């Protein structure tokens, strides 16, 4: 990432929440401490996937190590963000995604993370490709801008929302 982007990441997370899985989490935090802990460099914040929603999927994501990762971050004064919103079953329909988004935005506390999975084209190898295209279309729409305004939510770059010394609950 750093070679291609020519900068350290603003945040660290993992596809399908692997950053908090036992076995991966320990390697990740070791690398983070080695690369950013002692040097005084700005520390990338960690996404703790503690899903602030009801349902089986939300409970499963949270159970996959969110508490352990958050405990490590707190013990090491590492910047991190929890809760996470945006978990759903990729059900069809643009109006369904819009309703989900309205609910997530309405319950979003300060310094929460909202995950999304957009793509601007279908990929036949991706089982959630249709949902990705629907998300992309919605996120580009005036309806999304209106939903943000109605909920009083402002999008920003992660490093601007969470100062390196700040910890979200």
Language model features: what each stretch is:
Residues 2-11, 21-169:
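Terminal accessory/targeting
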